């Protein structure tokens, strides 16, 4: 008898997770694993997130809009420069997303599995800016 492996996402497998709250980051990582994604890198501070955004090997990023009181805009800018798709995660709704990026997919906190799955698919299907 052979083991059945979970279905892998079709277009991307590796995710950069940028979230300052450790428990939320851990929950998100578990949810991503359940959906068949791998966390390629994680960051909880702007400096770490910028470094990962510029150098890590990943297919998609999830960005908390506020990292310990600092807006995540520089990280989003770095991802755009690399042509990488990303999703914002926020508990503030649309007003929490930086103005230049209001058209990006937004994942509302608290996370729900189906919402996460849909936002990742939306980001992957969209154009890489």
Where are these regions (language model features)?
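Active-site residues of response regulator receiver
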Residues: 64
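Hydrophobic/aromatic residues positioned on beta-strands within the core alpha/beta folds
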Residues: 87-89
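Acidic, metal-coordinating helix/loop segments flanking the phosphotransfer/catalytic sites
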Residues: 42-60
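Two-component/phosphorelay signaling modules centered on CheY-like receiver
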Residues: 22-41
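Acidic catalytic/metal-coordinating carboxylates
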Residues: 69-74
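Conserved acidic carboxylate
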Residues: 19
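Non-catalytic signal-transmission and effector/linker regions of two-component phosphorelay proteins
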Residues: 1-14, 112-129
